[in-house]
């Protein structure tokens, strides 16, 4: 199971998570995790906002930014978010556990 971050803000429970679909949505919007070193002022808040897509995709960006501005332990938070963001990508690239029903391919 994928990692999740859970918290409450203004009496509303939030669950942050990345799925294949939310990562794909972020990529289609132009998000590139590889830009984190060159553009941290935009990439880090976008990484945080992207974690809302799986369970709270209609949350207003103003609310997300308000939550972000009140967060503590941001170094640990961003390390966790990067790990969480990479989980669906690793799952996509991993091999199936068993061979039954899997498609094999060859180059000719």
What are these regions (language model features)?
Residues 49:
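Oxyanion-binding/catalytic loops of NTP- or PPi-dependent enzymes
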Residues 45-46:
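Extended, low-complexity alpha-biased scaffolding regions
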Residues 1-9, 13, 21-24, 29-38, ...:
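Charged interaction scaffolds used for protein-protein
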């Amino acid at each position: 199971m994928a990692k999740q971050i859970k918290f409450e803000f203004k009496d509303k429970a939030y669950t942050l998570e990345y799925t294949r679909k939310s990562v794909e949505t972020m990529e289609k919007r132009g998000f590139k995790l590889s830009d984190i070193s060159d553009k941290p002022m935009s990439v880090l808040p976008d990484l945080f906002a992207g974690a809302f897509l799986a369970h709270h995709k209609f949350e207003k960006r103003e609310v997300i930014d308000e939550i972000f501005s009140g967060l503590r332990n941001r170094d640990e938070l961003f390390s966790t978010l990067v790990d969480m963001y990479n989980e669906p990508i690793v799952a996509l690239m991993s091999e199936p556990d068993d061979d039954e029903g899997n498609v094999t391919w060859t180059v000719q």
